[in-house]
């Protein structure tokens, strides 16, 4: 049974640790965090183990690097000497935006096998969309072990590494865009007289159901939009207002801006 070590238990690291504990024995999962109390609290919740960075680097089969891109160099400088002494096989798993597999290897000081992933926050409830690319040193059997261990996080989609940044601008940043949309829908409902809690529930469930309809029907979103817009009806008037406000262009610009920010992080 593979052991998984998570260095960094913030929003994404913590979400993936939760997912791992759904799929493998929790005593095979190790957590480390700069604030030890945070790792300890999550470990108690998940009934897994607390460790430190060095211990995870020494022994975990899959080492999840759950830190921000800006401090990845410091982390890998810290654990690099430990990795260099290892005789057992291990795989680094990076989720840092903008940092390529080659850059992670460079910072770690060795041509180590790396899996680059781009998860999103819904992974915390098993509904994530996780993009991933395996470096050349990762065997197919190891990829399968990784996927089996992380199946509780949601959907996984392999992607050429050159497209990870583009994909992350949609699926990784997208939850924030959708949350903003849900909030705006709820605000509109409140403006029309709905209680806040009801407006938020209606908006969130509508987005959830609409997303599932796209996935399960296989229909183009435009066709599903057209099906709701009756001639001379209320929906088409709302759509017209969104179009006049530049809704599509604003969403596209948000994705492009998020994508371009990756280049500042490299």
Which residues make up each language-model segment?
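Rossmann-like NAD(P)(H) cofactor-binding subdomain of soluble oxidoreductases
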Residues: 16, 36, 46, 54-130
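NAD(P)+-binding Rossmann beta1-loop-alpha1 motif at the extreme N-terminus of oxidoreductases
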Residues: 1-58, 62, 127-128, 190-192
